Amino acid sequence: MTDSASGASAVANIATPSNEPYDATRKQKSLDKTARIPIKIVPAEKLKKPEWIRVKAATGNSRFYEIKDILRANNLVTVCEEASCPNIGECFGKGTATFMIMGDKCTRRCPFCDVGHGRPDPLDANEPENLAKTIAQLRLNYVVITSVDRDDLRDGGAQHYVDCISRTRELSPATRIEVLVPDFRGRLEKALDILQACPPDVMNHNMETVPRLYKQARPGADYAHSLKLLKDFKARNPNLPTKSGLMVGLGETDEEILEVMRDMREHDIDMLTIGQYLAPSGHHLPVLRYVHPDTFKMFEEKAYEMGFTHAAVGAMVRSSYHADQQAHEAGFA
């Protein structure tokens, strides 16, 4: 297997966006979302999914439908659903979820992600209370709170994060809270100042991919800025763990992944996740390689050699997948 499949033949039917008039308030998904990004997606031959890519479905006696009902009753959104995470059956089945605050419309158009794009709705003032009550109702020992990007807000949504963290701690003081934050680009210092009022137990922000692929995969984001976010948070909170995640399969090389891992350690990032990118649809960035389990094992071994306190590395690993277990094994929960 080569490090990159970027030379795959571009054979695919090119679809066009819906003919509906453009409405910034409407949530755009799939082609409607990705058709407007600056660097167009180059179709590639679809690769056959290898046998080691296996998704665990929810079992008949799991809490899958109970969790969905509770979320709907409390007007809450999960990234598990919005991003079409392949692990949703397993996680919901075990009674865990990653809560997505501040709505379901992102101000960015990252073409690897299945979260919808559009002009976000105003913040829901009741969301911190609803979230905290749901976490208490589910009796969760560990929760992950993430969000869409909110470039429309002067603080990027930092105060809303603080409101959610503080209310959750009031109702569930024993619950550990990990946040998976956006990059707060253009308002980083303001956001970090606000988060200092009530910092999380684990600070997570995903680098996602290698710097060479940023313009293609993360339009609107900046590699150095994302590293700075985590380093600056760590400088303010030296006893709190920082965490970041990467996808493989977008056209990067193994050495580029290792170089990002070195950059992470140079910026005091403690915990690492690496997983296989799986395209949500034919209108998202194509999978250019399926990384072999032996290569994931190599990444894991190198991570511990570099000094990461914990490395969750494998095809089906996602940033918040088994996050409680990751934090426990790293000695933080």
Swiss-Prot record:
Pathway connected to this protein: Protein modification; protein lipoylation via endogenous pathway; protein N(6)-(lipoyl)lysine from octanoyl-[acyl-carrier-protein]: step 2/2
Subcellular location per the Swiss-Prot or TrEMBL entry: Cytoplasm
Domain of life according to the entry: Bacteria
GO annotations of cellular component type: cytoplasm
Note describing how the cofactor binds: Binds 2 [4Fe-4S] clusters per subunit. One cluster is coordinated with 3 cysteines and an exchangeable S-adenosyl-L-methionine.
Molecular function GO labels: 4 iron, 4 sulfur cluster binding; lipoate synthase activity; metal ion binding
Annotated binding of [4Fe-4S] cluster 1, by residue: 80, 85, 91, 320
Reaction(s) the record says it catalyses: [[Fe-S] cluster scaffold protein carrying a second [4Fe-4S](2+) cluster] + N(6)-octanoyl-L-lysyl-[protein] + 2 oxidized [2Fe-2S]-[ferredoxin] + 2 S-adenosyl-L-methionine + 4 H(+) = [[Fe-S] cluster scaffold protein] + N(6)-[(R)-dihydrolipoyl]-L-lysyl-[protein] + 4 Fe(3+) + 2 hydrogen sulfide + 2 5'-deoxyadenosine + 2 L-methionine + 2 reduced [2Fe-2S]-[ferredoxin]
Residue ranges constituting the Radical SAM core domain according to the UniProt record: 91-309
Pfam families in the record: LIAS_N, Radical_SAM
Main EC class the enzyme belongs to: transferase
Keyword Mitochondrion among UniProt keywords: no
Keywords linked to the UniProt accession: 4Fe-4S, Cytoplasm, Iron, Iron-sulfur, Metal-binding, S-adenosyl-L-methionine, Transferase
SUPFAM superfamilies for this protein: Radical SAM enzymes (SSF102114)
Region (Disordered): 1-29
Chief localization: cytoplasm
Family affiliation: Belongs to the radical SAM superfamily. Lipoyl synthase family.
Record-given protein name: Lipoyl synthase
Species whose genome carries this gene: Ralstonia nicotianae (strain ATCC BAA-1114 / GMI1000) (Ralstonia solanacearum)
Gene that specifies this protein: lipA
